[in-house]
Amino acid sequence: MRSGGLEMMSSSAIVAFNLKEGKNWWWDVNESPVWQDRIFHVLAVLYGIVSVIAVIQLVRIQLRVPEYGWTTQKVFHFLNFMVNGVRALVFLFRRDAQNMQPEILQHILLDIPSLAFFTTYALLVLFWAEIYYQARAVSTDGLRPSFFTINAVVYVIQIALWLVLWWKPVHLMVIISKMFFAGVSLFAALGFLLYGGRLFLMLQRFPVESKGRRKKLQEVGYVTTICFTCFLIRCIMMCFDAFDDAADLDVLDHPILNFIYYLLVEILPSSLVLFILRKLPPKRGITQYHQIQ
């Protein structure tokens, strides 16, 4: 009995020691300027890779259908190229960005790619909504004006928050700004759930022998799940970021948290979606290929 008790105490001591060592490792990495730069540079490389993949796909689409102008598909890939390219530059010069003055410039530099990411994937929701309503013989005339209006409202509100934060740099305004973006992320997640879910259910009702039905069904299902999950995670994380200093993403001494967060909400989702949507459009006779007016 006594030896068993000693073994249990020894096991508990080992577990406690391992937890302490793990905590110390996390702290050491977060506080080390060398590790901070390494992690931010790894993020820059990953974003750069995604950006290059997006622009390569854009060029392939242009070479395949040069007779079309700026279609939804081309704009989607171009925005992916821009968003990931800007993120790569931000993380490459992350330490310099943190020292920018006035401080409002730091917020703008870190927030603009997030807003552009929202616009990029809202465009995908618009594309699916158009397909869904066209298949049901419902007018889609109001969809694009709604898309531009929603984006304009989001950008105007965010710019107003930046201006107020510049005029009165209090912590309350930072909280409001982050909670606003949490709301925007939740709105995007619900958009994917609504129109991705509707399109998925509609495709399920098509005859089994329909050409491409199975592949398109999988494509819509996968992309809906990925995008809904990433925007929901972003929403939840923004709520923690707003109220908990330990979850602050806009500082240099949380590199591991930054790596996990941006990997889950931007890098992996963008990579997976670009892979799933890698199929090139047919050269002629394409009815779902919409040109941006």
Curated annotation (Swiss-Prot):
Keywords: Membrane, Transmembrane, Transmembrane helix, Vacuole
KO phenotype (gene knockout): When associated with TOM1 disruption, reduced efficiency of intracellular multiplication of tobamoviruses (e.g. crucifer strain TMV-Cg), characterized by a reduced accumulation of viral coat protein (CP) and reduced amplification of TMV-related RNAs.
Cytoplasmic topological domain residue ranges: 60-74, 129-146, 195-219, 277-293
Source superkingdom: Eukaryota
Listed transmembrane segments: 39-59, 75-94, 108-128, 147-167, 174-194, 220-240, 256-276
Pfam families named in the record: THH1_TOM1-3_dom
Keyword Transmembrane: yes
Main location: membrane
Cellular component terms (Gene Ontology): plant-type vacuole membrane
Record topological domains on the Extracellular side: 1-38, 95-107, 168-173, 241-255
Intracellular or extracellular location(s): Vacuole membrane
Matches recorded under InterPro entries: THH1/TOM1/TOM3, THH1/TOM1/TOM3_dom
Coiled-coil intervals: none
Keyword match Transmembrane: yes
Membrane topology note: Multi-pass membrane protein
Entry's family note: Belongs to the plant tobamovirus multiplication TOM1 protein family.
PANTHER family: THH1_TOM1_TOM3 DOMAIN-CONTAINING PROTEIN, TOBAMOVIRUS MULTIPLICATION PROTEIN 1-LIKE ISOFORM X1
Subunit relationships: Constituent of tobamovirus replication complex.
Role this protein plays: Contributes to the intracellular multiplication of tobamoviruses, probably being a membrane anchor promoting the formation of the replication complex.
Protein name: Protein TOM THREE HOMOLOG 1
Underlying gene: THH1
